[in-house]
Amino acid sequence: MTTESGSDSESKPDQEAEPQEAAGAQGRAGAPVPEPPKEEQQQALEQFAAAAAHSTPVRREVTDKEQEFAARAAKQLEYQQLEDDKLSQKSSSSKLSRSPLKIVKKPKSMQCKVILLDGSEYTCDVEKRSRGQVLFDKVCEHLNLLEKDYFGLTYRDAENQKNWLDPAKEIKKQVRSGAWHFSFNVKFYPPDPAQLSEDITRYYLCLQLRDDIVSGRLPCSFVTLALLGSYTVQSELGDYDPDECGSDYISEFRFAPNHTKELEDKVIELHKSHRGMTPAEAEMHFLENAKKLSMYGVDLHHAKDSEGVEIMLGVCASGLLIYRDRLRINRFAWPKVLKISYKRNNFYIKIRPGEFEQFESTIGFKLPNHRAAKRLWKVCVEHHTFFRLLLPEAPPKKFLTLGSKFRYSGRTQAQTRRASALIDRPAPYFERSSSKRYTMSRSLDGEVGTGQYATTKGISQTNLITTVTPEKKAEEERDEEEDKRRKGEEVTPISAIRHEGKSPGLGTDSCPLSPPSTHCAPTSPTELRRRCKENDCKLPGYEPSRAEHLPGEPALDSDGPGRPYLGDQDVAFSYRQQTGKGTTLFSFSLQLPESFPSLLDDDGYLSFPNLSETNLLPQSLQHYLPIRSPSLVPCFLFIFFFLLSASFSVPYALTLSFPLALCLCYLEPKAASLSASLDNDPSDSSEEETDSERTDTAADGETTATESDQEEDAELKAQELEKTQDDLMKHQTNISELKRTFLETSTDTAVTNEWEKRLSTSPVRLAARQEDAPMIEPLVPEETKQSSGEKLMDGSEIFSLLESARKPTEFIGGVTSTSQSWVQKMETKTESSGIETEPTVHHLPLSTEKVVQETVLVEERRVVHASGDASYSAGDSGDAAAQPAFTGIKGKEGSALTEGAKEEGGEEVAKAVLEQEETAAASRERQEEQSAAIHISETLEQKPHFESSTVKTETISFGSVSPGGVKLEISTKEVPVVHTETKTITYESSQVDPGTDLEPGVLMSAQTITSETTSTTTTTHITKTVKGGISETRIEKRIVITGDADIDHDQALAQAIKEAKEQHPDMSVTKVVVHKETEITPEDGED
């Protein structure tokens, strides 16, 4: 096991070479083997000289010591080579020696700069593929901090928003662009700082709270600011010494966003009283007072509620808080929250049902974007896990999981306290730095505070997660100015791309161009991304100018003047024409953006981009296409693969999938709003939003509630009602179009009548609810929702007076064509029998004959109110319901087919159907013409009699003008009629408290109980409110009786009132509403 190096060793005898070369190899290997004794070396030299003097070489006698030395050297060399073989698997140098052709990359290291809580900077190097925990451990080791679970690192993303660095993920996957700059901050504010084990932990918590106060994130009163400032001075400077402390010894400190001389004087006065207090005691007193502040440890996020009102969502140790205008309006403790989730930019909280609630409620909030919703969701998950759980929840390990795999990976508060109790090191020595970082007179949002509580703007404009020091703010402003100046120098005059031929779609978007390049060197994708980043600016318009090229410029120059750039997430195509030596070359080239939009979010789930951001379509086309729909990409992919699997033709699938996806996305919001309008009461439009108004009573006895929607102004109600009615008109038009298509393809009369019967239910009920009358709609057993717009009146007397009134509403739909426009200029003859109708069509925009079945709806509704008078008043018998017919309006050409509606009491009842100026006149004419057909007269004797809601369906067939101009006349003989009789009685007590709606009460609880039998459905809604210290309970019952036999409604009403009084003897009945709806056969209606 010896090695020979050099030619001299070859000439020596083997016996002499062995020990010497073994020693030389041993020295080269660096093995710590002792050298041979000097006597042995001298003896060997003498023997070698003696042997060299003779002509014949004499063999040297090898002593025992030399043999042992050689054997020991050989063993050492074998051991060293064995160690080298083991290290070769790990050492890059061994890899190079073993495989010299293989190039081993050294791990790249990134320089990280961390801003600490005292304003200083800490710089370190970490590997590029390191996880966040590595950097966080280095920072905590630098700070000599053991209780590090309360702290974290933050960074800014591309949108300049602060995010918490996830210690379980690689840093380069989180900080995707820019330098690695971080801030060290408190992440979880301990509810009881006295339970922290070390003073150094409390010191850094104090530094964070001082920054929160100065930045405006932690608002305080003047007295609290002075007290906390005095503890700060005591901790930093020690006892007050009049000899050393001048009048301005605290001028370098910063105590509040709006620092005043009065505040300094108060701080000095309180500082004198803290004599003898150690810095640790001063910091403890500081924390004991700071933890009592209402915004202590609250991480605020901008959001909007379901009505679009700007609010702030705060996450803290106790739960979720909701703020509006700096006031907390609601609180959801963690035990109350059942589930938190987000979808796109919506954030949802599912609330656990309370004591008097049967089902859980979900409250939704809208955040600025998807990333903000995800950021808020992560903060909630981390806070809930840290403060509420004993052990962190392990992330799901399934291959396919629904929802995000993100879980809090650190230790919980319980684990941290157990670990802190085991700390046995002596108290670390640390130097408390002076608060010179607060010397700037401006608050951290860049504006000088104007008042004691002028912190709302600071809270709303600054990022509410971490601390920003004035030095860093100034540095960031300087960096932004330098970037703007650099961009201004680099941007060249803009030249547009000239588009010719068959590509009109390209070139309609605004895109700045890259600076011209005079060389033709190949450009790598990295260089493209760098240049794209340098030219990252967008223009409002597209200026047409001609792009000129050099004759010798190559066709695929990737950085030429004709190079469009649409942004970081856009793919730009360049269409360029070059002329040189009589040849024309057309080239399409693809410019890579700085970073392709990833279809996977941080958790590995699909998140499709918004196609409106790509600007691949002109603005005029984007206005008509649902390109902003987030469902467009999923719909396109689904339809494409479906068609591809069915037809095995890629062109066929591509041709049909995009138009079909556009149609689906176009119909998606309309279908959702249509179903919501047909299924829900317009006055219940805020029903889902009022779930957030349920009270939250926490364990500490604090109760907060939101303001009820019932306290909104009447003007807002009117505006919402008008909007709802306009939407109903649009939906009615869509229904007529669907009905027309249905009737063209169907010939079954029974099916047609059933279709008409179904269509004739919802529009009447919806259109008739125009006035804000306290009326309950006819309920089917499935409809048990409580209308939130109804007001209950206080009083004790029932049946004192019955006042009868009629509020008829006539709903006559129009005949629609394929373009959803009304038929123009139609005259109608109506015979006295009212059965045969002969319409003459003068003009129809269709060239083919259409048979349209029209639904004509007439509803007459009568409401009787009970008041305090003891006499009966007869109903107005002069008004009669009009039989529907088509009325031609004499006027200018193009006037639409009108509908009539009666005016009673100056109210326009038919406003929700169509707003026509001739409504009242047409209604009177029709009423006079057809008074003989339907005559209603009634007298009220001992109980009121009603003739209500008549729904009639006529089948009217007519044809269009033929190409030759021949007029076609078609008359109908069969008139299927469906009659629905509806009666509504309202009893109200006479004693009405005038201050009922003026003073809002605090909603304590709300309970809904539903019990259903074969023929009766009873819904009980119990509402408890606190008004002026007085608890008030209101119980509202809805009883729906269904059956084939006749039902005595008077007896049922009396029985219901009797049961209510028996069940609640200490309560009074204030309002009774009876709504009767019976369906009679067509034979009875014709009689």
Curated annotation (Swiss-Prot):
GO terms for molecular function: actin binding; cytoskeletal protein-membrane anchor activity; structural constituent of cytoskeleton. Pfam families: 4_1_CTD (PF05902), FA (PF08736), FERM_C (PF09380), FERM_M (PF00373), FERM_N (PF09379), SAB (PF04382). Residues 110-391 form the FERM domain. CDD domains: FERM_B-lobe, FERM_C_4_1_family, FERM_F1_EPB41L3. The modification Phosphoserine is found at S88, S420, S443, S460, S708, S960, S962. Expressed at high levels in brain, with lower levels in kidney, intestine, and testis. Detected in lung. It is a peripheral membrane protein. Residues 394-513 are annotated as: Hydrophilic. Residues 20-32, 698-707 have a biased composition (Low complexity). The modification N-acetylmethionine is found at M1. The modification N-acetylthreonine is found at T2. It comes from the Eukaryota. GO terms for biological process: actomyosin structure organization; apoptotic process; cortical actin cytoskeleton organization; cortical cytoskeleton organization; myelin maintenance; neuron projection morphogenesis; paranodal junction assembly; protein localization to juxtaparanode region of axon. Tumor suppressor that inhibits cell proliferation and promotes apoptosis. Modulates the activity of protein arginine N-methyltransferases, including PRMT3 and PRMT5. This is Band 4.1-like protein 3. It comes from Homo sapiens (Human).
